[in-house]
Amino acid sequence: MAVVVSLEPPSSQAADYEVGPSKAHQGVDDIPWESLLPGDSVLIHWRREPYTAKWVVCRRGTAQRPIRVVGIPGPDGQLPAIDGRNATTRPVLNFWNEGRGVIKIGGANRPADVTPAHIIVENLEVRSGRAPFEFTGRDGKRRYAKNAAAVYVEKGEHITVRGCVLHDSGNGLFVGPGARDILIENCYIYGNGAEGSIYEHNSYTSAMRIIFQGNRYGPLREGCLGSNLKDRSAGLVVRYNWIEDGNRQLDLVDAGGKREFRDNPLYRKTFVYGNILVEHDGEDNSQIVHYGGDSGKTEWYRHGTLHFYHNTVISHRKGTTTLFRLSSEGEHVDCRNNVVYVTASGRYFALMVSHGTLDLQSNWFKPGWRASHS
């Protein structure tokens, strides 16, 4: 009879770190963010008062064993609130761009800087990461940056933000160009921006492959002039979302100096389908979708096809509404199976501004529509 003895060490057990009333950890600062391992879960339980904490996740999970940061709702479904106002950071953490976000993913000195992977942030209300609010970090009390975000993904791969409420920040969500394979799902993003500024948005993203699905986007904060969903990614999919108001509902522009994105074939293919886009009277811009670029360097523009189908667009504007603004003659839209309804007379609705090519098939537009108002 043969006896086989394995000399391999047993696989480490994933840990559940529970935070909240009557739990092992009373505060978010008690969690060892610097040493999370694949399969670990941070379970933040709802309590009546918000958690005034901010932190960085700079660790790597795996596809089978992601690192999860999960809110456990209250008795009536209330999400645990993470409030950036007067928030503190666990002293052992050391990371740059502290003023850019309440929850930050990627970019740290301690833990050691890696590209975070397979991170899930779920079921949290994250709010109030913006000027003039302050926080206490490694350099003492400081003010948030104007473009701070509720969730700031500086870099990472296979990052999911799901079921979160992101509001009252400069940007609700910010994803930098060091990110790839991003999923934003079933979130409610509203009430973000900076007063009088067009540069902060409900979400502002630039990634290699990103999907927005099942989200609700509400209006920006009063007096804020940014767009609702602004993106510079290669491999963008926007599907099954409700997107309401903003300077534009969708602002899909160029990747700027990120040549890796501009040279990728995915940069030329953008998919927007199954969404409801709503425009109320009084919004600053009469255009619903902008596609192509805004850098002024037309050679950087997308110069591809926006596949726009199975969407419902509703405009309550008393004046004109324009469905598409294409930034150059190199932009193209394949527009099919959409419904566009305006409450004004059909003659106040136009398909395009001037540039680019638009192919139409099986759409319903209010009778009297025009090709362009120009």
What are these regions (language model features)?
Residues 12-51, 55-57, 102-104, 109:
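Acidic Gly/Asp/Thr-rich repetitive segments characteristic of extracellular carbohydrate-active
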Residues 33-88, 113-124:
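Beta-solenoid repeat scaffold
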Residues 19, 42-44, 67, 189, ...:
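Hydrophobic aliphatic residue packing
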Residues 1-6:
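Bacterial N-terminal signal peptides
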